[in-house]
């Protein structure tokens, strides 16, 4: 059963501006250390695109679940061994997800990311499946 669907489109130039204007303060507020490490392995547009896709994924998840008690760093975007992106939740985000999933069900999160400068997009589906 679908619990929520979220989509977000980010102008990568807006993220570039935030990185330039606020630097470390912006990165520390929004991204986990692992997300930062992933983005910082890149340079130029690839770096800002990596940050923008992760920002879009966080926004898309909030649209799918809600924001109640969730901080940016409670939502982490990572990649599996094949490079597929996935979401890892902690803190307020994990608690909110647990409240949204009916008893006897388990949560499954689906994430798709895309970018084509100057845009980055994320789609998140929150699904509940029988345990």
Curated annotation (Swiss-Prot):
The keyword Methyltransferase does not apply. Mg(2+) binds at residues 8, 59. GO terms for molecular function: holo-[acyl-carrier-protein] synthase activity; magnesium ion binding. This is Holo-[acyl-carrier-protein] synthase. Belongs to the P-Pant transferase superfamily. AcpS family. The keyword Lipid biosynthesis applies. It is an enzyme of class 2 (transferase). It is found in: Cytoplasm. It holds the Pfam family ACPS. Transfers the 4'-phosphopantetheine moiety from coenzyme A to a Ser of acyl-carrier-protein. GO terms for biological process: fatty acid biosynthetic process. The gene is acpS. Keywords: Cytoplasm, Fatty acid biosynthesis, Fatty acid metabolism, Lipid biosynthesis, Lipid metabolism, Magnesium, Metal-binding, Transferase. Its main location: cytoplasm. It catalyses: apo-[ACP] + CoA = holo-[ACP] + adenosine 3',5'-bisphosphate + H(+).
């Amino acid at each position: 059963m679908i619990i929520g669907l979220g989509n977000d489109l980010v102008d990568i130039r807006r993220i570039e501006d935030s990185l330039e204007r606020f630097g470390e303060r912006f990165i520390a507020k929004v991204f986990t250390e692992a997300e930062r490490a992933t983005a910082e392995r890149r340079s130029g547009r690839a770096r800002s695109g990596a940050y923008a896709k992760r920002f879009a994924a966080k926004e898309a998840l909030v649209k799918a679940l809600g924001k109640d008690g969730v901080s940016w760093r409670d939502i982490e975007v990572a990649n599996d061994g094949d490079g597929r992106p996935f979401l890892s939740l902690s803190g307020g985000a994990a608690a909110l997800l647990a409240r949204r999933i009916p008893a006897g069900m388990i949560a499954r999160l689906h994430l798709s990311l895309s970018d084509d400068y100057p845009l980055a997009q994320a789609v998140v589906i929150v699904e509940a499946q029988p345990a």
